[in-house]
Amino acid sequence: MVKLDKIYTRGGDKGKTSLGNGERVDKNSIRVEAFGTVDETNAVLGIAIVNLKSPLKEMIFRIQNDLFDLGADLCVPDNKKLDYEPLRINQFQVDRLEEE
């Protein structure tokens, strides 16, 4: 699990943001765009759930959970040594999403 103790840096904007491992990247980087899009998708699904009934609701809950995992994967680059094992989207999750 990604551990974020705080959501601010007090370092000013300067067009940069921090990834889950502390690495600073441009806010317009493809990685930041990707996890922003994943987060927006998850938010839209959350709004859609309000008026849905099972089993569609249960399917969307599973998709949302997978999107949280994907966002965590995008937030922590694979090329850095971490003190913990990051989440990774696996083939089971991909196959299940494609079936649904």
Predicted regions: what they are:
Residues 1-100:
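Phosphate/pyrophosphate-binding loop motifs in nucleotide- or prenyl diphosphate-using proteins
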